[in-house]
Amino acid sequence: LSLVGSEMCIRDSAITGAIIVSTPQKVALADARKGIDMYLNDKVNVPILGLVENMAWFTPKELPENKYFLFGKDGCKNLAKEMELPLLAQIPIVQGICESGDEGVPAAVNTESIVAQSFLSLAQSVVTVVNRRNARLPKTKIVEVNNK
């Protein structure tokens, strides 16, 4: 992530807020921190709505109650707490995500699956934080990058 690159991407865009997505590894969390700092920078000034931890754990199809933390445990959860930001969701690695993608069927279609439940929880969290943001901050405007 670079401030200059991000300025080019968001210039002339109306951005309600940013959602930072990361995996739980320390190196990925370092990049997530940079992303948070970039959006909160005075030149960009985009509110952070929250964090999403992708690949939070692996759950095998045969043992859906088991969780294997392949990339570390609660990395985004801890970062969210440290940065005083909401953790919007922890999305597991589930074999069905890959299979559904290969078949062209959204993984969330099977409403009983852990994947669908994770994405539904994420969607509900996003609605909550956007409503909260809209209640306490001015209406979304086109981002004007301050080059001072």
Q: Model segments located where?
A:
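Alpha-helical transmembrane segments of multi-pass membrane transport proteins
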Residues: S6-E7, R33-I36, L40-K43
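Single conserved hydrophobic/aromatic residue that forms the stacking wall/gate
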Residues: L1-G5, C9-I10
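Conserved Switch II/interswitch segment of TRAFAC-class P-loop GTPases
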Residues: A14-G35
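Short, flexible turn/loop "capping" segments at secondary-structure junctions
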Residues: R11-A14, S100
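Surface-exposed charge patches
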Residues: L1, D37, N78
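C-terminal lobe/tail of nucleotide-utilizing enzymes
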Residues: L40-K148
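Short, conserved glycine- and acidic-residue-centered signature motifs
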Residues: S2, A28, V115
